């Protein structure tokens, strides 16, 4: 891929996507992003400019609702220069009333709409990368089982019906069924493009640009922000899982379309396991000035993930990508430094 390549990024104002757009511009790519409003598009352009990056290489198109049939048609018709499509747009929030209507259907339809638009209006597009989630791969929440490892071949066993039981199950289901839809599309339609899929775990790390509104961080960053806003006597849920840094998630999207060997592959982006307690312990150690304001929790529960999480085996992904992931300490420290800065 040369730097004259134009890359299409759906959902460009999302947490991962902003870092992705930033890295693409830094590497000399031209970027067409979709956003839900002019305000979001202008804000992203201004942020790129403020970061002294070539903001003229970023343009945006408005797609108010990715689940509407033909949502991406006009944007692709207007940009015949696009040869790579990175589909990051998907609903990710838990304040929903109708799980099927607000999470499951939009995720599946959004993916189908993007791929159908590429097939019909973007025959010159050769590479497509879809942002899925570890939720589509591994046994999650109630289904987690430490005795069953998760690999790039694994699928979450959740059913459509199980997905309707609560918003977290709805989110998990939306990721699984949207990713299934992408692979099914390629299988059935035999389009001009190759597909690869990125499946990140909990994504930590700093926002791409200076944070203007600290009350609205992405859902994963809220875990760190929630701890920083707690009081010494606050109680918290000791959440467990695996983490990956947002800068590595963005980088993986780029490597995924640049490298021939990654075409047709699923990648699991996970660096190491964590618990809310282990985040807290690290913050208190590395930011002693915050120690007196934070709860102590129960340090003996720092490795609670051992009993609660399926083991992730993603050696294949690491080998295909060929770069070393940012470690837990750097990811959390950089996140905290930005929030308190």
UniProtKB/Swiss-Prot annotation:
GO terms of biological process kind: lactate biosynthetic process from pyruvate; methylglyoxal metabolic process
Keyword check for Protein biosynthesis: no
Enzyme class: oxidoreductase
GO molecular function list: methylglyoxal reductase (NADPH) activity; oxidoreductase activity, acting on the CH-OH group of donors, NAD or NADP as acceptor
Protein residues bound to NADP(+): 40, 171
Catalytic activities: (S)-lactaldehyde + NADP(+) = methylglyoxal + NADPH + H(+)
Keywords assigned by UniProt, alphabetized: Cytoplasm, NADP, Oxidoreductase
Enzyme Commission code: 1.1.1.283
Location of the protein in the cell: Cytoplasm
One CC-aspect GO term: extracellular region
Remaining remarks: Has antigenic properties. Elicits a specific immune response in systemic candidiasis human patients undergoing malignant hematological disorders.
Protein name per the record: Putative NADPH-dependent methylglyoxal reductase GRP2
Organism: Candida albicans (strain SC5314 / ATCC MYA-2876)
Lineage: Eukaryota, Fungi, Dikarya, Ascomycota, Saccharomycotina
Gene name tied to this protein: GRP2
């Amino acid at each position: 891929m040369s730097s004259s390549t134009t890359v299409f990024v759906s959902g460009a104002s999302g947490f991962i996507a902003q870092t992705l757009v930033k890295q693409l511009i830094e590497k000399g790519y031209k970027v067409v992003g979709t956003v839900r409003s002019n305000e979001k598009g202008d804000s992203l352009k201004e942020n790129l400019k403020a970061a002294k990056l070539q903001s003229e290489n970023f343009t945006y198109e408005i797609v108010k609702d990715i689940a509407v049939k033909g949502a991406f048609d006009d944007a692709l018709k207007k940009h015949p220069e696009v040869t790579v499509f990175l589909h990051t747009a998907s609903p990710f929030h838990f304040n929903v009333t109708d799980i099927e209507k607000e999470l499951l259907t939009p995720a599946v339809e959004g993916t189908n709409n993007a791929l159908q638009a590429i097939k019909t209006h973007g025959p010159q597009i050769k590479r497509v990368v879809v942002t899925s989630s570890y939720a589509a791969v591994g046994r999650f929440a109630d289904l987690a089982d430490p005795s069953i490892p998760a690999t790039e071949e694994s699928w979450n066993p959740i059913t459509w019906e199980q997905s309707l039981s609560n918003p977290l199950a709805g989110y998990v289901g939306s990721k699984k069924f949207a990713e299934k839809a992408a692979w099914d599309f390629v299988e059935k339609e035999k389009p001009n493009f190759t597909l690869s899929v990125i499946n990140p775990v909990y994504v930590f790390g700093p926002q791409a640009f200076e944070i203007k509104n600290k009350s609205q961080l992405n859902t994963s960053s809220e875990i760190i922000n929630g701890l920083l806003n707690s009081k010494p006597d606050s109680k918290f849920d000791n959440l467990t899982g695996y983490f990956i840094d947002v800068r590595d998630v963005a980088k993986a999207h780029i490597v995924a379309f640049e490298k021939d060997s990654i075409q047709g592959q699923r990648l699991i982006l996970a660096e190491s396991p964590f618990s809310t307690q282990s985040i807290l312990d690290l913050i208190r150690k590395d930011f002693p000035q915050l120690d007196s304001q934070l709860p102590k929790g129960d340090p003996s529960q720092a490795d609670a993930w051992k009993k609660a999480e399926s083991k992730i085996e993603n050696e294949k992904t690491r080998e295909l990508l060929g770069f070393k992931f940012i470690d837990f300490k750097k990811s959390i420290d950089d996140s905290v430094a930005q929030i308190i800065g």
